[in-house]
Every structure is written in C-alpha cells, then in structure tokens.
Amino acid sequence: MTGELVYGRRAVREALRGRREVIELWTTERAVRAVPWLTEAKPKQRPERDLSELAGTRDHQGVVARVEPYRYADAYELAAVERPLLAVLDRVTDPRNLGAVCRSAEGAGATGVIVPAHGSAIVTPAVARASAGAVEHLPIAVVTNLARYLDEVKGPELWVYGAAGDAETTMWKADLGGGVALVFGAEAKGLRPLVRRSCDVLVSIPLGGRVESLNVSVAAALLLYEARRQRNG
C-alpha cells in the first residue's frame, strides 16, 4: 500500500484537518466511543493488536491513518518571506525532539523548520505523533548542506542566531524582532563548527539552577516565543 502512516488521536485529527489526503483510517471500537469526531470520519474498525502491528508501536491510542506522503517545503522560499521566523536544527536525531520543536514552532507562528538531509530526524509517524499533528500545518524543509544554506540566505533581512551555552549575548539582549533563523544543535554535541561559524550571533539562555543545559526542544520553545514576544511588543 502507498502512503505513510500517522497514529495517535491528535496527530490523526490534524491530518484530517491538514493538507494531506487521508487514504484510509482505522480505529478500535473503544476509540470510536471515546472520540466523537472519529464517527464523522467514517473509519474502519480493527482490533487493537492489528493496529499495533500496523503502526509498529502500541502508542497509537486506537487510531491509525494512512495518508499521502509528506510534502516538504522549499527552504529558500521560506527564507525569502517577509520577516521570516525559522527554527533550524543541526544533528537533532531524536524524532521526539523534532516533533516537540515542530509543535512549539507552529504554536509560535514560525515560518517553518529547516533540517539537514543527513544525520537528522525527518518527518516520520513518530515525529507526527510527538508534534501532536503540528507537522500537518507547519512547513518543514530539508537542505543538503546546512552551513552553506545559512550562508546563502542570511543578510540584512535575515539574521542567523545560534543557540550556544557559552555565548555572552543572552536571549534577553538579542534583537529577535526582525527576520531571524534560530539554529539549535543536538543537546550533547551542540552546533557543528561550520554551522556555528555561519551564525551572525551566538545567544545563550540564562540558567538559574545547577543544570548546564536544556533539552533542545525546550531551548527552541524559549527562543521562539521570545522572538514572538519581541515581534508583538
């Protein structure tokens, strides 16, 4: 069968509301009784074990859909919009982190998310589930060479800010009110040297406790919403 799977109640509901065609929808009898909107979608009922086998996980909440393949956006078109707000991920391999970043980015009204083609998570059923369906509404683009992409799109209308724990400039002092690309590295590794050098400014998130860093999805949420605050202020 063609297409991709989406599972989980929120992820499937957003798929039904989003841009992708839903080819097939399966649910358990219990899920149909618990979730009123499923009845309107006219799903096929299947035993829970069948859905677990189909999804490859038991974390489906009794709802699985087959949808058309995810259509990635053009990274250069995203950078070219007026006053873009981009979340750029460098070597973030955990699908749960990508999903969480996408959820925060969509909630903050970001223009889109950029990920490298190699060594990074891309949109999968697990990412859609972790994003609570945000990937269905948020443009996501894949680039071959992340450092080169940043060098090509940055300029007076788009500043590139890299999140780095050792940066002297804090997020409170950074000017995030214009067109910005916020770049985040993997939690343990940080930004790669070439990507770090492609940033116009490195910014840190002030920490008041004893931990040395935050999860990448938390850091992304903080900076995205600080950018939103400055834009709306």
Where are these regions (language model features)?
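Short basic, glycine-rich beta-strand/loop surfaces that mediate nucleic-acid
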Residues: 58-68, 131-135, 177-185
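Short, ordered loop/turn segments at secondary-structure junctions
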Residues: 30-31, 48-50, 118-120, 166, ...
